[in-house]
A protein has these predicted regions:
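N-terminal secretory signal peptides
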Residues: 1-14, 21-26, 34
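Blade-edge motifs of beta-propeller repeat domains
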Residues: 10, 34-69, 106, 110-131, ...
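Gly/Ser/Thr/Pro-enriched helix-cap/hinge segments flanking short amphipathic alpha-helices
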Residues: 39, 60, 372, 402-563
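Beta-propeller blade termini
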Residues: 71-81, 133-143, 188-198, 202, ...
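Hydrophobic beta-strand segments that make up the repeating blades of beta-propeller
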Residues: 87-91, 148-153, 204-208, 284-288, ...
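Short, conserved, GDST-rich strand-edge loop motifs in beta-rich repeat architectures
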Residues: 91-104, 210-235, 398-405
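Short, solvent-exposed loop/turn segments at conserved positions within beta-propeller repeat blades
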Residues: 99-105, 155, 234-239, 290-291, ...
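Beta-propeller domains
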Residues: 259-391, 395-409
Length: 563
């Protein structure tokens, strides 16, 4: 285990230059709006022929247990450290027992064979799961260079420590992550690894949903079993947001109250992380299901404050709460400030909140075209990702109804600079296949510079949408912290091209109950060389000049700041 390293100071000039929220927006050249639409964004589903034979089972049998509707997390993890993204698939369990003894309910880990195929290594790795699982979070919590797995589930989470030789160990109890609330078991959906105090060790923020017990599940719809329906979230009590501090010795301590979030309750779903105000501290957005959304502002010194109402993200543009599901926290309009994407259910809205650089957000859903495009769809996991490598972040959304009788196709919205257009119809001959989709995790699974998408669907096969969009230039970065956490979560990268700049944070908690690739991806369009600025969580500032395009570059944190 790596020893703690003293923090190196960053100069006031460097801090102002890189971290000033409004200042950064002014200093960075804006990315130009696309004046012409390039070739189509095209995908090809290569599963299950490629070895990804996972099927998500919810054990629904007409009883309408609430947990049946909201599982489906996927996690991208390079568990063997070979530079090729592997895939972890979360699964359900038997109802009402929540037992996983039947092999069809096991979670699955698939190793990337580097040739377009995958191999199921679940049994050897020892990561089958323990119960009715929901989501997954990936991060190197003990800084040993091996990515670990946190599995979120109903009435119990599981921490798998990566042993570094193809196996994992269940260290949940030893790590102190079996903490529940007020004497009852929690239903966790998602979590984010986040070094909120920048001490070099990854802490945890856990998004819990509602108070649910199989034997006490209310009956909704008609009294006849054939008329039963899934209950509205209002039928259930909200649950607390949990914060766990990494003690640096392999254990965690719950510090929710100490951090200032002791009374923060919600019906938490998707969780996403970015430094929205440019103070060098990671902040957290949590989408809530028919409850106000949360923006957890990191105040420093181990303190946090929920400011969703003040920041303008608690409700949609009409002042209404919606069925918040998936979330992402990235810069869609190229002004250097991270914005928020949130999905909802049909006849609600997908929300796009634009960071105005003044500590709050404006609802950009209507002006961007996202509002009109979202009405017919039930959106779950999602992501702001550059699918055509033009330097603009597009939107990918996993869609599907609450019930298995309402399958829907996934959606792709192309970013034209000032607005989005739905290009799903041209995304490939099999892209329109409807299923009850839930999770989506993003990675360049074949390392060709184009971002691919793995998608889960309830009682259906996992889909692996390989990106076949016509090639443009690109750059991917794998950051390795030395003074900062090894995963480099929270680092900010500024990529300067010939006429524009892009800002990205190392953040892998995306969408709904999912984890995407830790690597930072930039679409470069026609640029062949770029200039990089990296601000590490430790405060170290690093510059790299004349970086060639079309490569995966591994960057280790420098010993001191460069000028």
């Amino acid at each position: 285990m790596r020893m703690r390293t003293p923090r190196l100071p960053v100069t006031r000039r460097q801090f102002a230059r890189l971290l000033g929220g409004a200042g950064l927006a002014c200093a960075l050249p804006r990315i130009r709006a696309a004046t012409t639409v390039g070739g189509p964004i095209v995908f090809q589903n290569t599963a299950p022929a490629n070895g990804l034979d996972f099927v998500l089972h919810n054990d629904a049998a007409g009883r309408k247990y609430q947990v049946e509707t909201v599982l489906g997390g996927l996690g991208v993890i390079d568990f063997d450290g070979d530079g090729w993204p592997d895939l972890y698939c979360v699964n359900g369990a038997a109802l009402p027992s929540l037992e996983k003894s039947n092999p069809r309910f096991l979670n699955r880990l698939y190793r990337n064979n580097r040739d377009g195929t995958f191999t199921d290594v679940t049994q050897k790795a020892g990561v089958q799961g323990r119960g009715y699982d929901m989501g997954v979070a990936v991060g190197d919590y003990n800084n040993d260079g091996h990515e670990d797995l946190l599995i979120l589930g109903v009435h119990g989470n599981t921490l798998y420590r990566n042993n570094g030789y193809g196996t994992f160990s269940d260290v949940t109890e030893a790590a102190g992550l079996n903490v529940q609330a007020s004497g009852h078991k929690l239903w966790s959906v998602a979590a984010a690894w986040i070094d909120y105090d920048n001490d070099g060790y990854l802490d945890l923020i856990v998004s819990n949903y509602c108070d649910w017990t199989p034997g006490e599940d209310p009956v909704c719809g008609g009294l006849d079993p054939s008329e039963r329906a899934y209950c509205h979230p209002d039928k259930y009590r909200a649950e607390p947001v949990q914060v766990f501090h990494n003690n640096g010795d392999g254990t965690f301590t719950e510090v929710s109250a100490k951090a200032g979030l002791g009374n923060l309750l919600g019906k938490g779903m998707g969780i996403a992380v970015a430094d929205y105000d440019g103070d060098g501290l990671p902040d957290v957005f949590i989408a809530n299901d028919n409850d106000r959304n949360m923006l957890i502002h990191n105040l420093g010194g181990g303190k946090m404050k929920e400011i969703g109402m003040q920041a303008g993200i608690a409700y949609n543009g009409d002042g209404r709460q919606i069925s918040g599901m998936g979330a992402d926290f990235r810069d869609f309009n190229g002004d250097g400030l991270p914005d928020i994407l949130m999905t909802g259910l049909k006849n609600e809205t997908f929300e796009l909140f634009r960071n105005n650089g003044k500590g709050s957000f404006d609802d950009a859903s209507a002006n961007s075209g996202v509002l009109a495009l979202s009405r017919p769809w039930n959106g779950w996991s999602c992501g702001l990702v550059d699918l055509d490598n033009d330097g603009l972040l597009d939107i990918f959304i996993a869609c599907g109804g609450l019930d298995t009788n309402e399958p829907q196709p996934n959606r792709v919205l192309r970013n034209l600079g000032a607005r989005f257009v739905d290009v799903s119809a041209g995304a490939g001959p099999d892209f329109a296949i409807p299923r009850v989709h839930r999770g989506v995790a993003f990675a360049d699974f074949d390392n060709d510079g184009r971002i691919d998408a793995a998608v889960s669907s309830i009682n259906g096969p996992v889909e692996l949408w390989m990106n076949r969009t016509p090639m443009r230039h690109w750059l991917q970065l794998k950051l390795k912290g030395t003074h900062s956490n090894v995963s480099a979560l929270g680092a900010k990268v500024i990529c300067h091209g010939s006429e524009s700049a892009q800002v990205a944070f190392v953040a892998n908690s995306t969408g709904y109950a999912c984890t995407s690739d830790l690597r930072v991806h930039f679409g470069l369009g026609e640029d062949r060389k770029v200039f990089l600025e990296i601000h590490w969580p430790s405060g170290i500032f690093q510059q790299i000049k004349d970086v060639a395009c079309d490569q995966l570059l591994v960057i280790e944190e420098s010993k001191s700041s460069s000028h």
